[in-house]
């Protein structure tokens, strides 16, 4: 990616820290054929992770009334981390599956690598994360989820649904829920080998970090739990 942000984990997979370097990589080389030849699950998970940048960045920005120019620019272009992926995601996966890179795959790759990197560098640490990644970090303490090897972006895709429910973005939730089903992303706890009984530990971990320190309102454990329960009902 084009970002200067690094994520460091403990050996057991739980989050250790965020690390911002002085500058990102000087050169980024993208070969769409190489990506098309790679296992599609990595592109698939990358789409889920990238989409969170838009929802987290724009929601976090509502919690800061004094955004500077570069941060405001990052917020404005963050839609490029989600809109093209929703438009081209299913087709891009098919191109990857068939090892035939085309426009859809190229647009998605640019969203994952370039758009997200630019936004990340512009907005700084406080707007680089949010509730979806807070919940992802929460699920790192769920042993069953970890044991089944679910990918980072796969879990983040589910956590976007939590964010949208907590933030009462109902129309956007409906759209992304349908997109998630079409993409094969998780839409219920069982899809990531978790249960409602795991949520106390997950939520405690989720709210213990810095991910929602710049948010337009206080996120409470009940907000997250209620959101998960609502999503479970939709999935029935």
Predicted regions and their residues:
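C-terminal charged capping/lid subdomain of soluble metabolic enzymes
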Residues: 169-236
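A short secondary-structure junction motif
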Residues: 54, 58-62, 92, 115, ...
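A glycine/threonine-rich phosphate-anchoring loop and its flanking beta-alpha core
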Residues: 1-77
